[in-house]
């Protein structure tokens, strides 16, 4: 993500084929990371919409997932703004210590059909 007015790097949004060691696999994940100074400006949502458009219209995917720790309310809010739904299949991330409060993750998804309907609203 590049800020148009300044040309500065703000972060990234992308699609990723998940490794087999993660519970939602096999699937394609949408993910984002922004520098903290760029949080709250809608950049993740704007770029996420473009990534989903690419996923469904160019790559012809049928479904895209996203996940984050339960504590990451900002990312969960982005998932909602993208039209994604909580599939109620939380999982313990295998690469995070089980004793960590960041281990439990929530799983969201959006299908191509859901995305098309969301675009009409």
Mark where each language-model region is.
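Acyl-donor (CoA/ACP) binding surface of acyl/acetyltransferases
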Residues: 2-121
């Amino acid at each position: 993500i590049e800020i148009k007015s300044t040309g500065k790097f703000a972060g990234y949004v992308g699609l990723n084929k998940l490794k087999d060691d993660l519970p939602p696999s096999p699937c394609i994940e949408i993910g984002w990371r922004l520098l903290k100074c760029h949080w709250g400006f809608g950049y993740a949502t704007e770029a996420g919409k473009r990534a989903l458009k690419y996923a469904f219209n160019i790559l012809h995917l049928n479904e895209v997932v996203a996940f984050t720790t339960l504590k990451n309310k900002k990312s969960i809010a982005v998932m909602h703004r993208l039209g994604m739904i909580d599939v109620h299949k939380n999982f313990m991330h295998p690469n995070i210590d089980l004793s960590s409060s960041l281990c439990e993750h929530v799983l969201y998804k959006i299908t191509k059909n859901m995305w098309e309907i969301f675009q009409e609203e």
